[in-house]
Amino acid sequence: REWQAAIDEMTKLLSKKATERLIDKQLSESPDKMYAFFIFDIDEFKMVNDRYGHSFGDFCICSFSDILKSHFREGDILGRIGGDEFAAFIQVSDTECVEEKVKILSSALHTVIGRGDIRCSVTASIGIALYPRDGATFEDLYQQADRALYETKQRGKDGFTIVS
């Protein structure tokens, strides 16, 4: 039962609670390493749901999560932390590699998702916080990355912001 609560049923990604637990565990076990925490939000997802229905919206979320899964390594932490919001936590060597990674992700998430006769252009806004610079816990990093995500949305979506 605890395992079921740790996994998001639709996407098979970690739940928010499991994501938080694993990140805090990793930070306590390896506090001397550098990490990047990403929040991904599907742009205009409410409009997709309203226009094409919840079944297609669920299909979009699953397709989006599949794209994310294909761009992370085993050992990276990847979770669904809200309706159309996802998080990733990876070990990094420097901020330049974070920028390279997020550019690749942003490009991959700018896609067309289709099923049957429906085709929908999808983009994502991304906020990124770095450990240890931007916080010492999941909650710290989440708040900072969420602020960066908000900045991305304010600038017009379909992009990314790294906390500065």
Q: What residue spans do the PLM features occupy?
A:
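Cyclic nucleotide signaling catalytic output domains
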Residues: 78, 104, 118-119, 125-155, ...
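Acidic carboxylate motifs that coordinate Ca2+ or other divalent cations, activating on Asp/Glu
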Residues: 11
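Short catalytic/binding micro-motifs of nucleotide second-messenger systems
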Residues: 70-75, 107-119, 151
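Residue-level recognition of strand-loop junctions within catalytic nucleotide-signaling folds
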Residues: 50, 89-93, 110, 131-132
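Core hydrophobic beta-sheet residues of small sensory/regulatory alpha/beta domains
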Residues: 37-39, 162
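Conserved long alpha-helical elements within nucleotide-processing catalytic cores of c-di-GMP signaling
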Residues: 2-6, 14-36, 43-73, 79-83, ...
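A structural signal for short, well-ordered beta-strand segments
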Residues: 37, 86, 124-128
